[in-house]
Amino acid sequence: MKTKNRPPRRRTPMQDAEATPGEQTPDRSQSGSGASEVTKGLRSRTARASGTRAEVSRRRQGSSSRRENSVQRRLESNERERQRMHKLNNAFQALREVIPHVRADKKLSKIETLTLAKNYIKSLTATILTMSSSRLPGLEAPGPAPGPKLYQHYHHQQQQQQQQQQVAGAVLGVTEDQPQGHLQRYSTQIHSFREGS
């Protein structure tokens, strides 16, 4: 192993920062403007050194407080996320209790709950619109229906779905002899969820 030979460092004796050029000891003072320049240099060096020490201590204090703040923020964030998930799970449980389904031994998954809820809403909407369309004389007339916009929108969606089902049935070679009612389709889907799981 090689050792490095370095010359010993020369240290300039540090003067007291409060000392003025007049208070210097005679052996260290120099005559003329050179003495004041040396004193200024020593003072600035002393001030820089004490300022650096203060900065380092501030950095240490700042980094520890930053670390504590970071930990605190992370804990608060985790708690907010826990509360959010708790609320979400409670909402899913409330939805499971409202939707009619057959399986009582095992709770529905989130995707099953959402799918059944969507289809249940669609079937109820279709039933309500079917019941209300028989009472509205304007909806049975040929041509564009002057009825409610909800009915028109739903009727348009149903026509598109029927066309897609007919195209899919023609491609697969399946024909539907008797169209099923909306509630009957929904109950069939409930039973398929029960058998599938």
UniProtKB/Swiss-Prot annotation:
Database matches in SUPFAM superfamilies: HLH, helix-loop-helix DNA-binding domain
Region described as Disordered: 1-82, 175-197
GO molecular function: DNA binding; DNA-binding transcription activator activity, RNA polymerase II-specific; DNA-binding transcription factor activity, RNA polymerase II-specific; E-box binding; identical protein binding; protein dimerization activity; RNA polymerase II transcription regulatory region sequence-specific DNA binding; sequence-specific double-stranded DNA binding
Polar residues: compositionally biased ranges: 27-36
Gene Ontology BP term (one): intracellular distribution of mitochondria
GO cellular component terms, semicolon-separated: nucleus
Alphabetized InterPro entries for the sequence: bHLH_dom (IPR011598), bHLH_transcription_factors (IPR050359), HLH_DNA-bd_sf (IPR036638)
Tissue: Expressed in liver, spleen and olfactory epithelium. Weaker expression is seen in skeletal muscle, cardiac muscle, eye and brain tissue.
The protein's name in its UniProt record: Class A basic helix-loop-helix protein 15
Species name: Rattus norvegicus (Rat)
